[in-house]
Amino acid sequence: MAASGWARAAVIFLCACDLLLLLLLPPRAFATEGPAETPGEATPPPRKKKKDIRDYNDADMARLLEQWEKDDDIEEGDLPEHKRPSAPIDFSQIDPGKPESILKMTKKGKTLMMFVTVSGNPTEKETEEITSLWQGSLFNANYDVQRFIVGSDRAIFMLRDGGYAWEIKDFLVSQDRCADVTLEGQVYPGKGGGSKEKNQTKQEKGKKKKERDLKPRASKEDNRAGSKKEEL
């Protein structure tokens, strides 16, 4: 009986020691213990460290922006022009007798450029001042136009909405110092380009008069030469 009592006491003591160890040891000590890896199994690759945003270069920023564009719904107006859906064409508003009406509809919402020539052989500074006044007038009329000087007498007017290009063209050609406007390959003479055309017509008329005067003189000389031959 005494031996069995001592055995029970020893078992109870051992159980108490195990419980104390479980309570005192941290849980990580048990988490690290796991089944041994088999020789055929490969260890998973270490997780790639995330790059600090302060160390991003241009390529990283471009990839990040592209990812944001994929994840977020971007408004149609913020999309690049080549990604925007083309505006539907209302064929009821197209006049078959006016080709410009078709171009207005097809260029609506698209960027468009036109070339403007200033008359009077101006300097680049004068062209800058004159075209700046034209741009200001268009801005006051709620037209979004950007201007770039490309020569001593030439400038580019760029529109974000090409549907208004022909209205702006009509305004420009009515200005006193506008020689011409080139839009979609078509040259439209301006109010300031009339003097050149008048000079050209005067020169052409003068040439025609000279040709007319030379013809009777040549015929008279031919007649004189013929009469001399007859006398001989």
Curated annotation (Swiss-Prot):
Biased composition (Basic and acidic residues): 194-204, 211-232
Sequence motif Prevents secretion from ER, location on chain: 229-232
Primary localization class, coarse: endoplasmic reticulum
Biased composition (Low complexity): 32-41
Record keywords, A-Z: Chaperone, Endoplasmic reticulum, Glycoprotein, Signal, Wnt signaling pathway
Cellular compartment(s): Endoplasmic reticulum
A GO CC annotation given for this chain: endoplasmic reticulum
InterPro entries hit by this protein: MESD
Entry keyword annotation includes Transferase: no
Pfam family, one: Mesd
Location of the region described as Disordered in the Swiss-Prot/TrEMBL record: 32-54, 185-232
Location of region: Chaperone domain: 1-162
Protein's GO biological process: phagocytosis; protein folding; protein localization to cell surface; Wnt signaling pathway
Oligomer and partners: Monomer. Interacts with LRP5; the interaction prevents LRP5 from forming aggregates and chaperones LRP6 to the plasma membrane. Interacts with LRP6; the interaction prevents LRP6 from forming aggregates and chaperones LRP6 to the plasma membrane. Interacts with LRP4; the interaction promotes glycosylation of LRP4 and its cell-surface expression.
Function as written in the Swiss-Prot or TrEMBL entry: Chaperone specifically assisting the folding of beta-propeller/EGF modules within the family of low-density lipoprotein receptors (LDLRs). Acts as a modulator of the Wnt pathway through chaperoning the coreceptors of the canonical Wnt pathway, LRP5 and LRP6, to the plasma membrane. Essential for specification of embryonic polarity and mesoderm induction. Plays an essential role in neuromuscular junction (NMJ) formation by promoting cell-surface expression of LRP4. May regulate phagocytosis of apoptotic retinal pigment epithelium (RPE) cells.
Family note: Belongs to the MESD family.
Name of the protein in its database record: LRP chaperone MESD
Species: Bos taurus
